[in-house]
Amino acid sequence: LDEKKVPKEFFISKGTLDKWIYLKGPKRADRVTKTGHKYKYSEGPVTFPDALDRASRTIVTGEGGSGASRFKHVVETKSGKLRRLTPVELERLNMFPDNHTKEATDTKRAFFMGNALVVGVVQKLSKSLLKQL
């Protein structure tokens, strides 16, 4: 979407940027279970911001809301600002028509897209399966 058409609440504030960077970054920590078992927790980095010249990561149900998250998609605008994806962009990634979920709140719309299947892929699979019947 054109940056000018994106509501301001989708932009990441400088005050929360450090949290986003931490959550998207690699982590390694010693942990202990309730039963006393010690283990190493680790997770690799997530591309931040998301690359626009590659396939998108999976949309998850926690995509909505303004809070920082390891799993939410973040893109860099032409002017260098960082922002979350809008509901329409999430719909487009899943090949739904624009505003397919417009009756719901933005958070619920993102949740719906996190639970959705990519429509075009399902259509192609079904056509292929029907030919084999």
Model region roles, listed by residue range:
Residues 1-133:
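C-terminal target-recognition/interaction regions appended to catalytic cores
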